[in-house]
């Protein structure tokens, strides 16, 4: 999971239900920017949360319900509880998932579940890791048509990498503007709620609440 030490290079956006952005639009935007030769492209992780989806342990025949977080990008960016077993998997992994300790206990009776399979959204997924969360949650790779309501842009810190087209580094001070401009260029409406990590990291009290807010709204 991400830490507050890294908050300064992140920009968080929340999209209302009617303004959520399909995963395929995000991938198309990144491809388009790369084709145009733009420097300092952001690393984007986006996700949405659906409550009480059916999940099943196909081996034991146990079933239950869990909140499903569909993720485009890095699982660790969309998960605030720490990892207690296994790994987060790779960005390109479309067959792996992450589950909470509470769900592991409910369906498998233990936490040593990395490598086992769980069924959700009409597909079996191989469990890559387990998070320290007593509630029932599963994180899966997003599908093309999944509407993302939360988006995190990660830019290089100030002084790292090349400078952008305007001659400034996309670091803490320019993260918000860079994210908004990225969406504007690709005809994607900006999120209703916008939090610039440069300011969040300076306010520890607010910063601690951010991971809870972005995964529970």
Region spans (language model):
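Ordered hydrophobic segments in well-structured contexts
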Residues: 10-14, 43-50, 65-70, 98, ...
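Hydrophobic, Leu/Ile/Phe/Ala-enriched alpha-helical segments that form helix-helix packing faces
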Residues: 26-37, 103, 107, 169, ...
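Juxtamembrane interface at the cytosolic side of transmembrane helices
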Residues: 213-217
């Amino acid at each position: 999971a991400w830490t507050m030490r890294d908050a300064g290079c992140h920009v968080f956006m929340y999209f209302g239900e009617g303004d959520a952005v399909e995963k395929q639009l995000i991938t198309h935007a990144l491809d388009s920017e790369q084709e145009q030769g733009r420097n300092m492209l952001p690393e984007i992780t986006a996700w949405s949360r659906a409550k009480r989806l059916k999940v099943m342990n196909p081996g034991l025949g146990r079933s239950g319900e869990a909140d499903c977080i569909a993720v485009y990008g890095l699982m660790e960016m969309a998960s605030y509880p720490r990892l207690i077993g296994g790994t987060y998997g790779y960005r390109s992994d479309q067959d792996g998932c992450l589950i909470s300790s509470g769900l592991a206990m409910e369906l498998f009776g233990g936490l040593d579940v990395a490598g086992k399979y769980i069924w959700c959204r009409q597909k079996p997924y191989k469990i890559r890791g387990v998070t320290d969360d007593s509630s029932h949650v599963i994180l899966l790779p997003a599908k093309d048509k999944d509407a993302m309501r939360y988006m995190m842009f990660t830019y290089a810190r100030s002084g790292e990498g090349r400078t952008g087209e305007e001659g400034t580094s996309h670091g803490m001070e320019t993260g918000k503007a860079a994210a908004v401009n990225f969406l504007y260029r690709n005809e994607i409406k900006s999120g209703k709620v916008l939090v610039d990590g440069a300011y969040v990291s300076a306010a520890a009290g607010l910063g601690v609440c951010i991971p809870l807010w972005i995964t529970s709204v």
